[in-house]
Amino acid sequence: MEAIWLYQFRLIVIGDSTVGKSCLIRRFTEGRFAQVSDPTVGVDFFSRLVEIEPGKRIKLQIWDTAGQERFRSITRAYYRNSVGGLLLFDITNRRSFQNVHEWLEETKVHVQPYQIVFVLVGHKCDLDTQRQVTRHEAEKLAAAYGMKYIETSARDAINVEKAFTDLTRDIYELVKRGDITIQEGWEGVKSGFVPNVVHSSEEVVKSERRCLC
Amino acid sequence: MEKMEPSRQEVQPAACKASPPYSLESLSKKHCQNQGNLLHFDRQAPGRLTTSPTLRRLRSRGCGSVRGGARGTATAHAPPQHVALEVRTWCDLQEYPGSASPLSNKCPPESEHIWYVCVDTSRFYEHRRSSVVLNLPGLEVFPGDLLVSAGAADYLCHPLLLLNSESKKPRWPFSKRGVQGKDKNKHISDLEDCLSSLKITDFRDYEFHTLKIFMNTLKYLQTHEYLLDVDLWRLFANLEELSQTSFGFVNSLFHIFKDYVDICETSPSLDFISVLTKYFRGSLCQSHQTYCLNYSAAVFYLESLKQRHDFGIYLKWCEQHDQCRRLHLPELLVAPLHRLTRYPLLLKNIWKRSTDSTEKIMIYSIKEKVEKAIQDLEGKVKWLDNFQKFRHLQEIVVWPPLWDRDKRFFIPECLKHIFKEHMAENILSPTNRHLLYEGKLTLAESTRFLDVYLFLFDDFLLVTKTKRNKKVKKLGGSDPGLMCPSLTAELQTVIREGGSCTVIDQPIPLDRLLVRGLDPLHVSVFGLRNAFLIQHENRYRQCIAAFLLQAQTENIKRTWIAQITAAISRFTKSQETKKLSSFPLPAEPSGI
């Protein structure tokens, strides 16, 4: 039976406040752009399926960290349960770019002993006239940390899909190669889900072993 | 930190007004006679809560009329899909003189017991699932609250099971009760049976309802004498209170909007500011703070509990519930934290859209207040982390006396009292210093390699050798749940094994310390890799100690050198400013 998804990856989106984390996630998961962001209370994460190859789907569980930028001592606990992350800065805000280093250091400490794959995202690229960070220097910084760099815009829907799917594909390759493995007690990568097996709560108990694709 | 104190009330099981065969009088009588000889189970009794799709279908075909709650409290607040709910409050009991049941007699009047029981029994009559509503004196049935089997009624008033009174609560590890081998299997299967007799309402979109599923299931199991030694507070802290406060807030807000929509001609203004003020200036932030302060310790405690088979069964049972959306307890525990951090964002949006200038000022000040609360919390969490960490360090760092440190010094027994050192407590006090960096390295001695653990504080470096002690378990080390989550994995292992970190040499003040990375060419001759050298100089700049340290990787080595160098320069700078200014430094704000 074909799995609905092969794996579930958990991603976090981090970066300074007002760089557009929530907007990027909303654009990706709901396909819309809200002029005024409305943080939905009660929604802890967003989900979307991504098809990385025909028939091969990955479920992404994306955790927004909006509002927690200055609240790190207590939120660090869930860094470690992510396999990947989008590290955002705002291309019209130099400061947010300068803080990228700090964000990386912060996460590096807290994801141990697991590893996390980051992509550097220069957000709000539709505002090119107000640009304060050149593409060249962002690419250099990304390369220094072994990350990919991509420029996106949630407003104009530029590269939003690409940012997420590229990251997903990279993680998938690492999982396929065995560099990242599914581990008990770690939420970063989970194995796939096969439909039509589970009907009721009683049966969930019996068929709790999921298909390892 | 104070624990949640339930209101003092006598236990009074609620009556089942709507379903006459279950009147409390008859119930209690039969309860004392014989449990096996209980009432008929009416699966379609209107008062019965159910998650069964079949039953719901039957009801929606018209056999069960919708009943409002007694006092119209909880049901009125509940979304329309929850109408099958029948709420009973203790007020109803006044109408039932016979309610002085043996159940309540079992309980001492001063008991802090808070359960309300609405019974629908069948457990002993037939092996079908049945339910009891455990309710709180807040008079509302909260979604995610449990429907538990009738057998629970017997245990609910047992003084040993008063969950909120620490002193009375038995802490029996299962081993003490002889649960081993065969018994253990039976214990597990009994636990599974117990869980299978439990159902959860399928209400969604409520205040931390998924978390409450976990909490209430655990409570239920504890009333059945399972997992009694699991500390409910350490896992869920003040969740009950937090959930009620949040629910109250959302509810009041919702009602204001609803009233506004319903009767907008008569009340042109939408006065939700008063609700915002009431809750945000009231207990909402405080409740979140209490919860969040416990959060990291809870996650850590959970990790230690996961090793247990019986706890694992409980977790799996809850996690498989639809409402948990394949999420696990660790990630659900974070929900209240997310909630708190989103409040300023929401308030900011309201502020942006508001047109009235006084309203704008009010909203802004509320937003500021919440942000301040979060900032305070961050400060408190850090402080607590640091405090606990130092407490553990005091425990595991051993300072050998002078004569043990260096055999040159001869101190006769009669003189030893002069050298009584109270070093450990003073030197490792959280108020005096901060731990900047730490980790395991290998120390190259002339004849051997030694496993060492280094602590870099903001004013000195401490080199200790780790000693494993697998036989003797220290008291503090026997319960990993008591350990500090901020300790490194290595130190946790040391503690778990009852080991210690023995100080090798005196602390090296940072202004007397030299660090240099060693050229790979130089040291490879001696079979050393990723090595660096630490020198300790005395006041006259003479070297009095040297440590040749080896790191696992080149990266770790570089980090160590960078950390030490940065600490030295910070320390020197702070010394200079101390000398320059005769004024004391201003106190740090709580958030830093």
UniProtKB/Swiss-Prot annotation, chain A:
The keyword Nucleotidyltransferase belongs to this UniProt entry's keyword annotation: no
Alphabetical keyword list: Autophagy, Cell membrane, Cytoplasmic vesicle, Golgi apparatus, GTP-binding, Hydrolase, Lipoprotein, Lysosome, Magnesium, Membrane, Metal-binding, Methylation, Nucleotide-binding, Phosphoprotein, Prenylation, Protein transport, Transport
Membrane topology term: Lipid-anchor
Reactions performed catalytically: GTP + H2O = GDP + phosphate + H(+)
Pfam families in the record: Ras
Cofactor (UniProt): Mg(2+)
Record's GO cellular component terms: cytoplasmic vesicle membrane; Golgi apparatus; neuron projection; plasma membrane
SMART domains: RAB, RAN, RAS, RHO
Binding site for GTP: 17, 20-23, 37, 40, 67, 123-124, 126, 154-155
Region (Switch-I): 35-43
Cysteine methyl ester modification, residue list: 213
Residue numbers binding Mg(2+): 22, 40, 64
CDD domains per record: Rab39
Compartments (UniProt record): Cell membrane; Cytoplasmic vesicle membrane; Golgi apparatus; Cytoplasmic vesicle, Autophagosome membrane
Entry similarity comment: Belongs to the small GTPase superfamily. Rab family.
PANTHER family listed in its UniProt record: DRAB11-RELATED
Domain remark text: Switch I, switch II and the interswitch regions are characteristic of Rab GTPases and mediate the interactions with Rab downstream effectors. The switch regions undergo conformational changes upon nucleotide binding which drive interaction with specific sets of effector proteins, with most effectors only binding to GTP-bound Rab.
Protein name: Ras-related protein Rab-39B
The species this protein was found in: Bos taurus
